[in-house]
Amino acid sequence: GGLKFDVAALLYINSLYILLVLLPLPLKYSPGYQKNAKWVFLISNSIGAGLNIMDYAYYPFTLKRTTGTIFSQFSNEQNFAGLLFNFLVDYWYLLFLFVGLIYVMAKLYDRIQVVRPEAIRWSFYGIQFLALLFVAFLFVGGVRGGWAHSTRPITLSNAGDYVKAPEEMNIVLNTPFSMLKTLKAIALKEVDFYTSEALNKI
């Protein structure tokens, strides 16, 4: 079950990179284009990896996956820089792990050599366009969790289909998916109907 959410998260994170690679343009074989595509790949996946690594330390305090509500939770924090510094000091080994992952990703990426076709004919555009459509088909199925007509884009609640207890949903989910699916979540605002003086009189 967790694989379905991992695939969806990876597709969301790499959506821009996938588009850059599959666009049927001869320009994509230029060194400048390839360099920019590499940076898009590294930055996008570094964010995803960073969120998962961060949650390794954050989870014991919240007992749930980090969601988009974290931004509202820290929006009024006056000493955020101090908290971040203390986090990096306490979990310095996670920082090394994060840097190491980025280094490995960059090295593995450099092993892939993109070769420009000797001659770009009309068949090039046709094949590239068909490849784009095929990957788009796979992409839609991946982010939706399937291709069935009744299938909708999977959300956090779908993790309950693969566990026996609600607290086990965090094992199935991953942090990037949880963050992306809750960025537009509506935060409930605190409303005061009575003043403190009125409450004391009741």
Residue ranges and their predicted role:
Residues 113-117, 190-202:
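Extracytosolic and intramembrane catalytic regions of membrane-associated proteins
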Residues 1-188:
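Transmembrane and membrane-interface helices of multi-pass
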